[in-house]
Amino acid sequence: MRIAVSACLLGEACRYDGRSKPCARVQELAANGHELVPVCPEVAGGLPTPRTPCEIVRAPWIGSVEAPAADDGTPSFLTSEPHRESNGRSGETKHGRSDSASRDSKARAANERSWAILDASGADRTAAYARGAQAELARAKEAGCELAILKAKSPSCGSGEVYDGTFSGTLVPGWGIAAAAFRDAGIAVIDETADFNRLSRM
């Protein structure tokens, strides 16, 4: 099986701190006949190594992390209901349109403004992360990868939980932008803490 793997787990020094995060359990899969394809969305997106750490920062109105993918390709973990400001009259926005009428027209804009990937200095790195996610997804698909083992908790690669955007070490349910893109494209995603026993025998 061809497996896309976060390059830092394979020993490549591409993390934000300029180091690697080698995982022997992941590396041993190659000895069991699996072909490991290294990926690093941050580097593919043009970010330097080392770099200022980043986290996904969400607006208060962010929706469910399990919401379906948006039509414009926004990863499903980032889709949300639009934020609407009330004019005090039930069912209407401040512009006089009903909530139901304004929902569809504002949904796409909400997807764009309800989240961002910021570094610890406040700089917006969303474009680089999105660019890298799509580049590595394309490479994984071209290689025929059926599975991705991606670094836990990362704003690119986390699957199931990520840091909450406060740079305090707090975790919240969610997906990294690349992990969500892989998942939405039909590539199964796990992290390095998963049980590889069954996979090792495949």
Spell out what each predicted region is.
Residues C145-V162, T166:
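Internal, conserved structured core segments that host functional sites
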Residues K21-T79, A101-L118:
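Short, surface-exposed acidic-centric catalytic microdomains
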Residues A13, L47-P48, S156-S159:
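Short catalytic/ligand-binding loop motif for oxyanion handling, primarily in non-cytosolic enzymes
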Residues M1-I3:
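Extreme N-terminal starter segment of soluble prokaryotic enzymes
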Residues G11-G18:
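Short N-terminal binding/cap micro-motifs at the start of the first secondary-structure element
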Residues D72-G73, R84, G88, G96:
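Short hydrophobic alpha-helical segments enriched in small aliphatic residues
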Residues N32, E42-A44, D72, W115-R139, ...:
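Divalent-metal-activated hydrolytic enzyme cores
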Residues C8, K151-S154, A194:
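Short, well-ordered beta-to-alpha junction loops that form the rim of enzyme active sites
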